[in-house]
Structure formats: structure tokens, C-alpha cells
Amino acid sequence: DRDNYPMFWGLPCIRAFHSIVPASIMEFYPEIGVTRDVASRPERSCKAIRYLFSVRYYFDEVTPDNLEPEGIDLPGFSYYDTQNGFHIYKNDYALPMGFTFDTYVSRSQWETYSESDRCNLLLRALVLEDDAVETYQKDMQKLPDAVHQMSDEDLLAECTERAKTACDSFTYNSKGFHATISTDHENLVFFSVPWEEGWSAEVNGEPVAIEKADIGFMAVPVAAGDSEITFTYHTPGLKAGALLSLGGLVLFAGYLTVAGIYNKRHPNPKTESICCVDYSTEETAN
């Protein structure tokens, strides 16, 4: 019953009771052992997604057994304040939206790891679909099979590395989002925004392909140097549907016009208009 508090507070949150979400979200969560039916409720044991999704604060409800802040089992989170019945912890390793990786893992290789290993691995390597590996393997190193397990110290070290190549700015509106980044070589910039067919992207004003990364999210290629990245979303079929609806209205208006002209030129014969009748029930004598 507390899933949607952040919606009232005006804060984006990875926890929500919401059944209308992109299909890629439904694909992603089961891959790391998280049930996703009508709500997103990742447990704290799945630590890496708090950093991957750029979570900055964690709200821990005050209960009779938790009257004083005693810390939480998320590395890098420190006590910040207590407000509105919640102990608030701040992520001192919070990542900006948009960052790069030097290492990748193919989707088929990813499937060989356990669900518990997969979650933390998301901070160490970018998961690429098998058909995208050939295109981007020249810019990134393949993850060695022996380094897929991570400790809390490893997790924070990877956060530090991701922060070094993060976007300088990130803004969003109702149509999409815009980011800037500086890189020293060609790479993919990852955004923890769910992948959908309605997205299009430009880098420095030129259209680029959007790659599906980390099972259900997006990444775009950038060249070395400064890059301005713009993502724009258009609901698939919305424009075509609007045009078809407009065309239908035009045809209907044309039909009414033609029918009106025809009726004026070919009026129906006038008939007597009868309002009502009456009759007698009395028998007529012979």
C-alpha cells in the first residue's frame, strides 16, 4: 500500500504499483530473479539496480522495531534524515543518468550465469544482444568468464568507474530526453530507460540506431569527443491512426454534402401528412 508514495511526492522511483509498463520491463526483471506482475518491488538483495537506475535516496519506513536509523544493507548508502515516517538514506555513489562501459557480455553468455550473479554483473558489463556484439566488440572488451561474481567492494568500485564516463548533463520533458557526454573513444552510452519501438535518437543532430542493452533498456553509439544525445518518443501508430481518422471525417463530410445536393435535385413526392384518426365502436343497426 506504499508503492506509489513517490508519485504523490513528485519523485521518480523504481518501486511502483503500475500495470501499464513497457514490455521490456516485464522481460528484464525475471532475468534477475525479480517478480514483475502488476508492481515493481525489487528486494534490497538485488543491489546493483539501485546504482544502475541512478537511485539517489532510499526510504525505510519507521516501525516499532525500527525507531532509530540503524543503517541498511546497501553499500554506499548513508543516513540522511527522518521525514514523514521514513528514515532516508542517501546513495553516496549515485550515478548520473547515462554512462558507458568498457566491458560487454553477450546475451547468450549472460544466460549461463545464475540470477543472483546477473544482478550485480549489470554494473560491470553491458549486456548486448548477440547480433550487436560483432558491431561493438571492437570498442569494448569481452567479460572474462571468471569475473562474473562481485563483492560489495567490487560493486562500489564499478560505480566509481561508471561515474568517470557518465553524462555531463541530463534533462527530460514529455517528448523525451537530452544528454551531453565527453568520451575518449567510440563507445555505447547506456540509459536506464525502458526500450520501446517508439523511440528515435540523434547524436549531434544525426540519426543513430538505438541498441537494446541490459535486456530491456537502451544505448546509443557515440564517437570520441563531445556528443549531444537526444531521444524522442512517438507512440507507434498514433500518427497513422490520426491521419486515418481525419480521412474518415473528410469522407463522411463529403458523403453528407453529396447526399444533400442529391436530395435537393431529386426531392421526394409530397404526401399528405396524417396526424391522427378516430373510429366509432357503436354498432350500426340495419
Model-derived segments and spans:
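Conserved luminal/periplasmic juxtamembrane motif of membrane-embedded glycan-processing enzymes
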Residues: D1-T165, N173-H178, F190, T271-Y279
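Active-site-proximal, structured, solvent-exposed surfaces of multi-pass membrane proteins
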Residues: D130-Y279, E283
